Amino acid sequence: MSYKIDRKTYAQTYGPTTGDRVRLADTELFIEVEKDLTTYGDEVKFGGGKVIRDGMGQSQVRRADGAVDTVITNALIVDWWGIIKADVGIKDGMIFEIGKAGNPDIQDNVDIVIGASTEVIAGEGHILTAGSIDTHIHFICPQQIETALSSGITTMLGGGTGPATGTNATTCTPGSFHISRMLQSAEAFPMNLGFFGKGNSTNEINLIDQVEAGACGLKLHEDWGTTPSTINSCLNVADKFDVQVCIHTDTLNEAGFVEDTINAIAGRTIHTFHTEGAGGGHAPDIIKICGEKNVLPSSTNPTRPYTRNTLEEHLDMLMVCHHLDSKIPEDIAFAESRIRRETIAAEDILHDLGAFSIIASDSQAMGRVGEVITRTFQTAHKMKVQRGPLSQDSDRNDNYRVKRYISKVTINPAIAHGIDKHVGSIEKGKIADLVLWKPSFFAVKPELVVKGGSIVWSQMGDANASIPTPGPVHGRPMFASFGQSLIKSSFTFLSKNSIEQNIPNKLGLQKKCIAVENTRNINKSNLKLNTKLPNISVDPQTYEVFSDGELLTCEPLDEVPMAQRYFLL
């Protein structure tokens, strides 16, 4: 005979179920469980007197016969494809199944077999997301990687060689020597990494050399000269070798205007960085490029969201990043031309409409590497407060909005860079890069990060305490961050050509190297929940932004959630 319990008791024991709602951190965003794949009365839970014991929730099935390595029980999955309650099985570092875990000898509808070889991570009362992907990294210092990991980032793509002047300004790892050294350096870090070569050359052989050396993409940056001719040659090489091109366009309009850049791109797929323009790009109207179908538009997080401090902090940041001199009036004019309250305000709304598709950091080059996920959901909160529920949502929940925004830092950057077969979502067969959050700390501080099926980072108390919880509790690297476990749990993304040329073996790389693929035959319609193609115009005098004739504007926030309430410093 079944035993009935009320919803509150059930949620406290097994986590929320279908119809229950959860608040995300201290925002005004609420999600509602759409479906529960576990079975009422047959839920599995670990602990003294609980279900996962031999002959009960734990079966006699050996690992070789199908038992998983790890099960995350009763987690609330938040992904682009849904917000559901489920158990997640992990085997050989991959997502084995999403469904119902347990012992098939005594339980029905078991998708994930628990055996003596199975470890348990309790997901009850927690949110589970895919590890996030930051595609705008200036590799200025290696400490960025730990900071990113501690925020829930598990893949970083970008360029650089360390704190060189070029890297401080541009996300390029120029030439085969530097690409080789950065690929070798990647062996030391519990992070999926990939490096962009410098895309600014009208001689295609210079670009081919970098792709053959292992670059997973090419970056065009105005500080190296993003002219129509370099755009064309870079895209020609990308089309031949199936790598993505990222572009930071010509702020000063020296070699042409935004229309000339669009003509040079000529309908070919391209990832536009900081498409609003404060981070760089044709002033004042680069933002209109987000209406092109072949353009995959992203933002960087210094303008996310628009607040009362956004404009004030940008000028000094920009002067430092781009090696400008405050004593030179032309340098100041260059910087000021990029900082426009009107386009930054419009950027908020374009994200909410799904016209901007990706958010990344611009790490230490105006952006903050540990705040990508936080600022993404601060933007979602701001838009909920200022614009109300989306038409796809209701007064009960913000599910569609949350799925739209989680897509911007997970599946969409993965699709844009040809790695979505491996990372970017919680789906069967993908690498088990997973992040577990307490709802009250969602998008702020992960409770635990799983990398390639092993725990790589976790909130942890005093190592000399009698239990794991006494303070000071803070994020710390775990065993998968060290030794050969690190090598097996993290991956490096390279061009297919470089792998065929045996570059990983020539460089002595031990991490598994994965080829990027299908970067050229995609467009904005391939991205998830962020496919709108507005007709954008910008008033050249006032900088006001119009979408299909409608003015896009909003007020800055005086106070954001997920901020001082969570951080001492």
Swiss-Prot record:
Annotated catalysed reactions: urea + 2 H2O + H(+) = hydrogencarbonate + 2 NH4(+)
Gene3D superfamilies: Metal-dependent hydrolases (3.20.20.140), Urease, subunit C, domain 1 (2.30.40.10)
Chief localisation class: cytoplasm
UniProt pathway: Nitrogen metabolism; urea degradation; CO(2) and NH(3) from urea (urease route): step 1/1
Subcellular location: Cytoplasm
Protein residues bound to Ni(2+) 1: 136, 138, 219, 362
N6-carboxylysine found at: 219
Enzyme Commission number: 3.5.1.5
Name of one Pfam family that matches: Urease_alpha
Cofactors that this protein relies on: Ni cation
Family annotation (InterPro entries): Amidohydro-rel (IPR006680), Metal-dep_hydrolase_composite (IPR011059), Metal_Hydrolase (IPR032466), Urease_alpha_N_dom (IPR011612), Urease_alpha_subunit (IPR050112), Urease_AS (IPR017950), Urease_asu (IPR005848), Urease_asu_c (IPR017951)
Family: Belongs to the metallo-dependent hydrolases superfamily. Urease alpha subunit family.
Protein name, per record: Urease subunit alpha
Native organism: Prochlorococcus marinus (strain AS9601)
